[in-house]
Each structure stands twice: as structure tokens, then as C-alpha cells.
Curated annotation (Swiss-Prot):
EC number(s) recorded for this UniProt protein: 3.5.99.-
One annotated Gene Ontology cellular component of this protein: plasma membrane
Gene null: resulting phenotype: Deletion mutant does not grow on N-acetyl-D-galactosamine or D-galactosamine.
Induction: Induced by growth on N-acetyl-D-galactosamine.
Protein name: D-galactosamine-6-phosphate deaminase AgaS
Keywords recorded for this protein, A-Z: Carbohydrate metabolism, Hydrolase, Repeat
Catalytic activity, reaction form: D-galactosamine 6-phosphate + H2O = D-tagatopyranose 1-phosphate + NH4(+)
Similarity field: Belongs to the SIS family. AgaS subfamily.
PANTHER family: D-GALACTOSAMINE-6-PHOSPHATE DEAMINASE AGAS-RELATED, N-ACETYLGALACTOSAMINE PERMEASE II COMPONENT-RELATED
Protein function: Catalyzes the isomerization-deamination of galactosamine 6-phosphate to form tagatofuranose 6-phosphate and ammonium ion.
Keyword Hydrolase: yes
Any one Gene Ontology BP term: carbohydrate derivative metabolic process
The SIS domain, residue ranges: 45-197, 215-364
Amino acid sequence: MPENYTPAAAATGTWTEEEIRHQPRAWIRSLTNIDALRSALNNFLEPLLRKENLRIILTGAGTSAFIGDIIAPWLASHTGKNFSAVPTTDLVTNPMDYLNPAHPLLLISFGRSGNSPESVAAVELANQFVPECYHLPITCNEAGALYQNAINSDNAFALLMPAETHDRGFAMTSSITTMMASCLAVFAPETINSQTFRDVADRCQAILTTLGDFSEGVFGYAPWKRIVYLGSGGLQGAARESALKVLELTAGKLAAFYDSPTGFRHGPKSLVDDETLVVVFVSSHPYTRQYDLDLLAELRRDNQAMRVIAIAAESSDIVAAGPHIILPPSRHFIDVEQAFCFLMYAQTFALMQSLHMGNTPDTPSASGTVNRVVQGVIIHPWQA
């Protein structure tokens, strides 16, 4: 490497860095567009949401699937509707387990490219299995199959994200968060909309501004060999996505794991050693937060990990007893909003860890065996 090489300098000019940095602007652009589409969206959705026994499945592959993991629990509790998260990779292999012909279905398909074989096949299988099936694809690619098929369908409403969210880098960054914010705004507009979400955008922008040129490293630099992200409820989905970002951008050179704080005790905690970094996403809900802090204190008492870092909206004696990050000041955030803040740190950590290990984050898979749009999938026709 040249003598003046630094990870921060290498990040400059990558698509991945640009796509991380433009997220707050992209969210407001998309939610403003949803404001303009509200009447048309309501015309499509309101008759469906009145149907008894309507199932709403949030689906996608990889990172796109984790959107459902993050937001489905809150959407279900907030709206009282039957939201669930099922990856396309499960719908395609086991449609008989998830698609019930007796219940009307709204399939919300997330996709950056909209061309993943499983995503296209999941739509076809849903139509094949469920007589009363409707579709709301939320995608970043106007030319993708998900979008194009939907605009030519009578049972679908296609929602297109701003063009800049069709990430050119290998890993999904602005695409996941913009699709996530947009789905929340569609189904919970009284809570998530282009005005209220400015608080989230501003807080995340403050995080990115505080991180500067990323030269310091989000969690510092140390010779760790493993990272574990922990989060409760929907934040476990954010932890899962955070772990995947590290695996993708380091091409597996840094092993990454995720769990819930309570689940981590039941075996997975065995992986913690003196080369392990643990990051705890602390819930903003006062009840859930107790469990997060219990595990945080326990991990620090164990003194097995190289470092245990808490990221929280507010400090406490337990949080402050070890390495921690306090989110920039703002109003109280519910966890589904706070997830966006946690992902800013996780995406930036993955980018800088990739560069620190000598990878090229826009194309981290030197072998070419892992692709931006998955390849090698054979879709087998369903035969009842």
C-alpha cells in the first residue's frame, strides 16, 4: 500500500460510502413521494385492509428479507393487522407452509434490483396458491421484473424508490433503509411520514456528521476476529442485517453473528472470547431495555470479550460502565425509528472494516462466487 494510504482515504470515491451518506436525503424524498401518492395508495389498500383474515407478508431475499424482521412486529402491534415476515427464499422452497388459499393475501415484496430469482418466483407462487392475492412491490429499480410485472397487473400497486437508492455498491445500504421507511409510511402514516421522519433523518445525519471522514473507526480498531450484534424484538432484525453487512464487505474475513440479548445466553454466548467484539443495540422501550441492560452488565462482568459496546439513546449507570455510544440528542424514538440510527453505525463499521482488511467494498468478493444480484438459482415449478 502507498505510504499515505488510510481506510478513510480509500473510502472516498466508493459507491458504498456515497450510498451510506445520502440516506437521510433519500428517505425524505421517498416519503414526500408517498405523500403525493397517498390517494392512489388508499384506493388500492383500504378495500384490502377491510378484508377479514387478510394476511400481509413482508418478503425479500437477504437484506431485503430483514426489512420484514425489523418492522413487521411493530406494524402488527401498531395497526392490529396480521403482518408477518417470510423470506422469499422460504416461500419458494416451502410455499405450502406459508401460502394459505383460504385467506386473502397482500404480498409486500422488497427488492433492490427487483430481479432476484426467488423474488420473482415468490410472486408467481403466491398467485398460483392464493386465489385472492394482491401485491405491493417496494423496489429501487424501475427496470426490474418486480416493478415491471406489477405495473402491468390488475392486482398490484408498484412503489418505486428514488433512483439513487438502487445501490451500485455490492452491499445494500440506502436501499434497505429507504424501502423500510417507505413501508412504514404506507401503513402507519400518522406516525411515520415526511414530516415526523425528519427527526430520524436529522439524527442519522448527525451520526454521519459526527463520524466525519470515518477515519477513527466506529468502534475503534482492534485485532478482533468476531463481532456479535445483539438486539431485542425488531432490533434483532437490525442486528442480523448489521452482521450480514460485516460478512459481505469483509468477504467473511471477520466472522459476524447476531442474536437477541435474552437468546444469546442459550448457547450462542459460547462463541465469546478475547478476540470478540460485542455490540448491544439498547431498546428505547423501558420494559425491553431492562433485559438489554441485564445482558450488557453480564457480558462486562464475564470479562471474556475483547470489547462490549452499548449503543443507546440515553445513558445509565450500566451503559456508562464500559465502552458506549449515545445517540445524538432528539425526541424520544420508538425502536422501529431507532433501528435506522443503529444501522448508520453498523454500515459505517462494515465499510471501514472492509477497507482496514484491504478489501474493495464495492466489489468485496474477490472470487466472484457471491454476486450483487444472486446467480445460480434454479426455480423448480410447483406441481400440486
